[in-house]
Regions:
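Short, structured coil segments at secondary-structure junctions
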Residues: 80-82
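Short acidic, Gly/Ser-rich segments with clustered Asp/Glu that frequently serve as metal-coordination loops
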Residues: 4-6, 64-69
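Active-site beta-loop-alpha junctions of metal-dependent nucleic acid enzymes
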Residues: 25-50
Length: 163
């Protein structure tokens, strides 16, 4: 999670698909574990079980209490089968998730520390996410994450993912 200060009601959940440097970010208000589970359920509902499994085979996170619903995150509500694996990094070892740390660094350009994010809307955050999709990335030979995503998957899946 990316928050600004502890008094904020809003939090930004950030995910990245590392092979494509493809970020997804979601604005959440006072999120609990069930809200994180619902976020993953919404993605699976929009893109389907097989696409979810291909896109997110592994979710690597810190030990944030909002990721404690392990079965809710890893088991499909659609099929009842495992949709992904969930692993937790060791405490204070950010080097275990460098792609997430890099994404959070990029997000800080839009959402600086010590600046409240409580007045943001989901639409504001979606615009930031889409701008990250079309920004060339060095590790992708200056292609964009959207280019990489649509080449590997499809434009149709890209649009479904952003619903």
């Amino acid at each position: 999670f990316l928050g600004s200060i502890t008094t904020d009601n809003n939090t930004i959940l950030s995910l990245i698909q590392p092979d494509m440097q493809f970020p997804l970010i979601e604005l959440m208000t006072n999120p609990k574990a069930i809200d994180v589970t619902k976020f993953f359920d919404k993605i699976e509902y929009n893109i389907g079980f097989d696409n979810f499994k291909r896109l997110f085979p592994v979710i690597l996170t810190d030990r944030d209490p909002r990721f404690t619903d392990i079965d809710g995150i890893t088991i499909s509500k659609i099929t009842g089968a495992e949709r992904c694996k969930l692993f937790f990094c060791d405490p204070y070892v950010s080097s275990q998730k460098p792609n997430v740390e890099n994404l959070n660094k990029r997000l800080r350009r839009y959402f600086p520390k010590r600046k409240s994010i409580d007045n943001l809307t989901k639409k504001d955050v979606k615009k930031v996410c889409e701008s990250l999709h079309i920004k060339p990335v060095k590790i992708l030979d200056h292609y964009t994450p959207k280019d990489a995503f649509t080449k590997i998957f499809s434009e149709e899946l890209y649009n479904l993912l952003l619903k």
